[in-house]
Protein backbone atom coordinates (compact mmCIF):
# COMPACT_ATOMS: atom_id res chain seq x y z
CA UNK A 1 0.00 0.00 0.00
CA UNK A 2 1.03 3.63 -0.36
CA UNK A 3 2.97 5.00 2.58
CA UNK A 4 3.78 8.52 3.74
CA UNK A 5 6.77 7.45 5.82
CA UNK A 6 9.64 8.26 3.39
CA UNK A 7 8.11 11.61 2.41
CA UNK A 8 7.55 12.78 5.98
CA UNK A 9 10.97 11.55 7.14
CA UNK A 10 12.67 13.52 4.36
CA UNK A 11 10.66 16.67 5.12
CA UNK A 12 11.40 16.64 8.83
CA UNK A 13 15.09 15.84 8.29
CA UNK A 14 15.81 18.35 5.52
CA UNK A 15 13.92 21.26 7.02
CA UNK A 16 14.36 20.49 10.72
CA UNK A 17 10.66 20.92 11.34
CA UNK A 18 8.97 19.69 14.47
CA UNK A 19 5.52 18.21 14.64
CA UNK A 20 3.66 18.27 11.33
CA UNK A 21 0.05 17.65 10.37
CA UNK A 22 -0.06 15.34 7.38
CA UNK A 23 -2.88 16.06 4.92
CA UNK A 24 -3.85 13.28 2.54
CA UNK A 25 -6.75 11.86 0.57
CA UNK A 26 -8.46 8.53 1.20
CA UNK A 27 -5.90 6.61 -0.86
CA UNK A 28 -3.31 7.25 1.85
CA UNK A 29 -5.72 6.78 4.76
CA UNK A 30 -4.30 3.45 5.89
CA UNK A 31 -3.69 1.99 9.32
CA UNK A 32 0.02 1.84 8.54
CA UNK A 33 0.26 5.56 7.81
CA UNK A 34 -1.86 6.59 10.78
CA UNK A 35 -0.03 4.40 13.30
CA UNK A 36 3.34 5.66 12.06
CA UNK A 37 2.39 9.34 12.22
CA UNK A 38 1.02 8.99 15.74
CA UNK A 39 4.09 7.04 16.85
CA UNK A 40 6.45 9.88 15.89
CA UNK A 41 4.20 12.57 17.31
CA UNK A 42 2.72 13.92 14.10
CA UNK A 43 -0.91 14.66 13.38
CA UNK A 44 -3.06 13.97 10.35
CA UNK A 45 -6.08 15.20 8.44
CA UNK A 46 -7.31 12.64 5.90
CA UNK A 47 -10.42 12.00 3.89
CA UNK A 48 -12.31 8.76 4.45
CA UNK A 49 -14.42 6.88 1.93
CA UNK A 50 -18.02 6.93 3.14
CA UNK A 51 -19.25 4.51 0.49
CA UNK A 52 -16.60 2.01 1.58
CA UNK A 53 -17.19 2.55 5.30
CA UNK A 54 -19.14 0.38 7.71
CA UNK A 55 -22.88 0.79 8.19
CA UNK A 56 -22.46 2.59 11.52
CA UNK A 57 -20.64 5.49 9.88
CA UNK A 58 -23.12 5.61 7.00
CA UNK A 59 -25.98 5.80 9.50
CA UNK A 60 -24.22 8.66 11.33
CA UNK A 61 -23.71 10.52 8.06
CA UNK A 62 -27.36 10.19 7.01
CA UNK A 63 -28.78 11.02 10.45
CA UNK A 64 -29.83 14.69 10.39
CA UNK A 65 -29.13 15.13 14.11
CA UNK A 66 -26.26 17.52 14.78
CA UNK A 67 -25.88 19.09 11.36
CA UNK A 68 -25.31 22.84 11.13
CA UNK A 69 -26.58 24.41 7.89
CA UNK A 70 -25.57 27.57 6.11
CA UNK A 71 -28.21 30.23 5.46
CA UNK A 72 -29.39 28.94 2.07
CA UNK A 73 -29.29 25.26 3.08
CA UNK A 74 -26.73 24.33 0.41
CA UNK A 75 -24.09 23.20 2.89
CA UNK A 76 -24.04 21.46 6.25
CA UNK A 77 -21.50 19.95 8.61
CA UNK A 78 -21.20 18.07 11.89
CA UNK A 79 -18.60 16.10 13.80
CA UNK A 80 -17.98 13.68 16.63
CA UNK A 81 -15.10 12.23 18.60
CA UNK A 82 -14.99 8.55 17.77
CA UNK A 83 -12.55 5.65 18.26
CA UNK A 84 -11.75 3.85 15.00
CA UNK A 85 -10.13 0.44 14.65
CA UNK A 86 -7.38 0.34 12.03
CA UNK A 87 -5.27 -2.50 10.69
CA UNK A 88 -1.53 -2.31 10.13
CA UNK A 89 1.53 -4.54 9.88
CA UNK A 90 4.14 -4.62 12.63
CA UNK A 91 7.43 -6.48 12.82
CA UNK A 92 7.75 -9.28 15.38
CA UNK A 93 11.03 -11.19 15.54
CA UNK A 94 11.92 -9.86 12.13
CA UNK A 95 8.67 -11.01 10.54
CA UNK A 96 5.65 -8.94 9.42
CA UNK A 97 2.56 -9.58 11.53
CA UNK A 98 -0.92 -8.19 10.95
CA UNK A 99 -2.23 -6.20 13.90
CA UNK A 100 -5.12 -3.96 14.90
CA UNK A 101 -5.27 -0.92 17.12
CA UNK A 102 -7.82 1.72 18.04
CA UNK A 103 -7.13 5.38 17.33
CA UNK A 104 -9.09 8.23 18.87
CA UNK A 105 -10.15 10.62 16.12
CA UNK A 106 -12.42 13.48 15.29
CA UNK A 107 -14.69 12.68 12.35
CA UNK A 108 -15.92 15.70 10.40
CA UNK A 109 -18.79 15.17 7.97
CA UNK A 110 -19.91 17.78 5.49
CA UNK A 111 -22.39 17.92 2.62
CA UNK A 112 -22.50 20.29 -0.33
CA UNK A 113 -25.37 20.71 -2.78
CA UNK A 114 -22.86 21.43 -5.55
CA UNK A 115 -20.95 18.22 -4.80
CA UNK A 116 -24.23 16.29 -4.78
CA UNK A 117 -25.18 17.62 -8.22
CA UNK A 118 -21.73 16.74 -9.57
CA UNK A 119 -21.91 13.18 -8.20
CA UNK A 120 -25.38 12.68 -9.67
CA UNK A 121 -24.26 13.94 -13.10
CA UNK A 122 -21.18 11.72 -13.11
CA UNK A 123 -23.20 8.66 -12.13
CA UNK A 124 -25.82 9.40 -14.78
CA UNK A 125 -23.17 9.01 -17.48
CA UNK A 126 -22.38 5.54 -16.13
CA UNK A 127 -26.08 4.66 -15.88
CA UNK A 128 -26.65 5.69 -19.50
CA UNK A 129 -23.77 3.46 -20.50
CA UNK A 130 -25.19 0.61 -18.39
CA UNK A 131 -28.53 0.92 -20.19
CA UNK A 132 -26.76 0.79 -23.54
CA UNK A 133 -24.82 -2.27 -22.39
CA UNK A 134 -28.04 -4.07 -21.50
CA UNK A 135 -29.42 -3.43 -24.96
CA UNK A 136 -26.19 -3.95 -26.89
CA UNK A 137 -24.18 -6.59 -25.04
CA UNK A 138 -21.92 -7.43 -27.98
CA UNK A 139 -20.49 -3.89 -28.00
CA UNK A 140 -18.95 -4.31 -24.57
CA UNK A 141 -16.34 -6.22 -22.59
CA UNK A 142 -14.93 -5.83 -19.10
CA UNK A 143 -12.51 -3.13 -20.20
CA UNK A 144 -14.80 -0.80 -22.10
CA UNK A 145 -17.74 -0.95 -19.70
CA UNK A 146 -15.71 0.08 -16.65
CA UNK A 147 -17.79 2.25 -14.32
CA UNK A 148 -21.06 1.06 -15.80
CA UNK A 149 -20.91 -2.67 -15.12
CA UNK A 150 -21.60 -2.27 -11.40
CA UNK A 151 -25.08 -0.99 -12.25
CA UNK A 152 -26.01 -4.08 -14.28
CA UNK A 153 -27.48 -7.11 -12.50
CA UNK A 154 -26.52 -10.66 -13.54
CA UNK A 155 -23.50 -9.46 -15.54
CA UNK A 156 -20.71 -12.06 -15.76
CA UNK A 157 -17.32 -11.74 -17.46
CA UNK A 158 -15.01 -14.42 -18.79
CA UNK A 159 -12.03 -14.41 -16.42
CA UNK A 160 -9.55 -14.97 -19.23
CA UNK A 161 -10.85 -12.84 -22.09
CA UNK A 162 -12.96 -10.23 -20.31
CA UNK A 163 -15.82 -10.92 -22.69
CA UNK A 164 -19.37 -10.87 -21.36
CA UNK A 165 -20.72 -14.36 -20.77
CA UNK A 166 -24.33 -14.99 -21.68
CA UNK A 167 -26.16 -14.69 -18.39
CA UNK A 168 -28.62 -17.26 -17.07
CA UNK A 169 -30.87 -14.38 -16.02
CA UNK A 170 -31.76 -11.36 -18.13
CA UNK A 171 -29.56 -8.31 -17.61
CA UNK A 172 -31.25 -5.43 -15.84
CA UNK A 173 -30.42 -2.12 -14.23
CA UNK A 174 -29.65 -2.38 -10.51
CA UNK A 175 -32.09 0.25 -9.28
CA UNK A 176 -31.48 -0.62 -5.61
CA UNK A 177 -27.75 0.03 -5.93
CA UNK A 178 -28.39 3.34 -7.66
CA UNK A 179 -30.81 4.41 -4.92
CA UNK A 180 -28.30 3.49 -2.20
CA UNK A 181 -25.55 5.49 -3.88
CA UNK A 182 -27.82 8.52 -4.30
CA UNK A 183 -28.31 8.74 -0.55
CA UNK A 184 -24.62 9.56 -0.07
CA UNK A 185 -24.25 12.06 -2.91
CA UNK A 186 -22.49 15.23 -1.78
CA UNK A 187 -21.22 13.88 1.54
CA UNK A 188 -17.55 13.88 2.53
CA UNK A 189 -15.83 12.56 5.63
CA UNK A 190 -12.56 13.72 7.14
CA UNK A 191 -10.80 12.00 10.04
CA UNK A 192 -8.18 13.77 12.11
CA UNK A 193 -5.99 13.52 15.16
CA UNK A 194 -6.53 17.25 15.79
CA UNK A 195 -9.54 16.91 18.04
CA UNK A 196 -9.35 20.42 19.53
CA UNK A 197 -9.66 22.19 16.20
CA UNK A 198 -13.07 23.30 14.98
CA UNK A 199 -14.88 21.59 12.13
CA UNK A 200 -14.26 24.59 9.86
CA UNK A 201 -10.55 24.60 10.70
CA UNK A 202 -10.26 20.91 9.84
CA UNK A 203 -12.08 21.36 6.53
CA UNK A 204 -9.88 24.36 5.65
CA UNK A 205 -6.73 22.38 6.46
CA UNK A 206 -7.88 19.53 4.23
CA UNK A 207 -8.77 21.83 1.35
CA UNK A 208 -5.43 23.63 1.70
Model-based region annotation:
Residues 1-208:
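Anion-binding and metal-coordination hotspots
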Amino acid sequence: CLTLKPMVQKLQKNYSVGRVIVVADKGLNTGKNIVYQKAIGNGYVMSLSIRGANQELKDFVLNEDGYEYNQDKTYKKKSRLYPREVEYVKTVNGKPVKAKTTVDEKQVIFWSADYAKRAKAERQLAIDKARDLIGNVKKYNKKNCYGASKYVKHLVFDKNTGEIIEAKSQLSLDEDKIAEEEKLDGYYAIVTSEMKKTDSEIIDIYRG
